[in-house]
């Protein structure tokens, strides 16, 4: 690609991005927290109460707000989305068993599988989205696995395949219903990694509620942040009570005795973190609407662009946490030049997640033929997607 084309491409993308963003900001990150006066007010109330650790009214307030948004009776707050994932895998017990993980995900997903004693097996995303490709997954299962004594086993390794992780990538709701049907056919559990997808809905169900367990992240770059934090969504009360006990150091409830009945974890969210989240979630619908407006502006302005495009979602209502822009195939070689150009102009876009099967610590993990995830990584950039008033 010649320098004239590269320069014209970079200028075109920069110009269009700027048209979508407020002009009174000196630099733009992919996603920054929305810390309004309301948030500071709730934080001050929490500090005044002195309840800043693992108990306090803000844990209950944030939990109730999430129950109303998500439509689940059973939600636990954790100290990170990664902890929530670990707890889900620990609860279904994946020790020495394989777990299907999309290669297009954040590193916390396979890390949590390994920390819980499992072995990730990576599969591709679809051409039309960054989410797991159900048809590709089914073909991979047919070729590589068989049902033996009621368990799904790898034909080569003999190991049991226990679970499929469905990642709702960048906030876009995956077709979880189809994957759950496929999982049932192979006697597999399904865990939903909805880390960035709070507010995303498909088939009138909030992400994280269709499978046995789902997780949300409240990291600093999420649509609602608690600084660090996460949540576990449960379908069954039994799982909820089990995990609640384990993440609370397995302490036996008593007014004054301090006793424990198993080796537990301390993975709860602190009240002060919950206060930070509650101060934002009060305005959740307003935030969602602003995010969707920004996404639509991006879609409109890049709809007939010569160089790039935005993948549009089908049959789902998404929170538009992060909007991703993709170069057309013939301009793939301009990817790094474009990112560098935009960063030099104070628009701090990022690459997409590098596919997990390409990372050095996972290079020996089994995986399907992965084409779409690699192409998306090579052509995609995450645009400034913060909540702009």
Region locations from a protein language model:
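Phosphate-binding glycine-rich loop
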Residues: 52-98, 104, 112-114, 122-124, ...
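Active-site phosphate-binding strand-loop segment of PLP-dependent enzymes
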Residues: 128-226, 233, 237-238
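Anion (oxyanion) recognition and catalysis
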Residues: 114, 180, 184, 343
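Hydrophobic/aromatic ligand-binding patch that stacks against planar heteroaromatic rings
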Residues: 111-113, 182, 206, 272
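PLP-dependent aminotransferase class I/II
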Residues: 60-64, 69-73, 135, 147-159, ...
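Structured binding elements
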Residues: 117
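N-terminal "arm"/small-domain region of PLP-dependent enzymes with the aminotransferase-like
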Residues: 1-52, 383-384
């Amino acid at each position: 690609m010649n320098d004239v084309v590269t320069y014209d491409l970079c200028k075109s993308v920069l110009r269009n991005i700027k048209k979508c963003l407020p002009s009174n900001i000196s630099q733009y990150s992919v996603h920054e927290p929305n810390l309004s006066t309301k948030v500071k007010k709730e934080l001050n109330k929490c500090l005044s109460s002195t309840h800043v650790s693992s108990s306090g009214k803000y844990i209950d307030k944030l939990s109730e707000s999430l129950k109303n948004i998500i439509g689940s009776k059973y939600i636990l707050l954790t100290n990170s989305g990664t902890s929530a994932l670990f707890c889900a895998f620990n609860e279904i017990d994946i020790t020495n068993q394989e777990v299907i993980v999309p290669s297009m995900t954040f590193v916390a997903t396979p890390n949590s599988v390994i920390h819980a004693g499992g072995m990730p097996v990576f599969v591709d995303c679809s051409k039309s989205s960054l989410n797991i490709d159900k048809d590709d997954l089914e073909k991979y299962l047919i070729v590589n696995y068989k049902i033996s004594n009621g368990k799904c086993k790898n034909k080569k390794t003999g190991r049991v395949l226990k679970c499929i992780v469905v990642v709702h990538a960048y906030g876009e709701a995956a077709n979880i219903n189809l994957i759950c049907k496929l999982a049932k056919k192979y006697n597999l559990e399904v865990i939903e990694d909805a880390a960035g997808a709070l507010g995303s809905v498909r088939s009138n169900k909030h992400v994280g509620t269709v499978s046995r367990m789902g997780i949300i992240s409240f990291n600093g770059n999420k649509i609602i942040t608690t600084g660090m934090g996460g949540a576990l969504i449960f379908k069954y009360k039994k799982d909820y009570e089990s995990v609640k006990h384990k993440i609370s150091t397995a302490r036996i409830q008593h007014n004054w005795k301090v006793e424990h009945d198993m080796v537990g974890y301390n993975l709860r969210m602190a009240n002060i973190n919950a206060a930070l989240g509650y101060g934002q979630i009060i305005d959740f619908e307003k935030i969602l609407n602003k995010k969707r407006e920004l996404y639509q502006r991006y879609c409109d302005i890049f709809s007939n662009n010569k160089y790039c495009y935005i993948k549009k979602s089908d049959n789902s209502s998404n929170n538009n946490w992060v909007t991703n822009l993709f170069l057309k195939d013939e301009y793939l070689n301009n990817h790094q030049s474009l990112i560098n150009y935009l960063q030099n102009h104070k628009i701090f876009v990022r690459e997409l997640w590098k596919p997990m099967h390409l990372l050095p610590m996972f290079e020996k993990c089994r995986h399907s033929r992965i084409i779409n995830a690699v192409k998306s990584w090579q052509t995609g950039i995450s645009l400034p997607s913060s909540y702009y008033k």
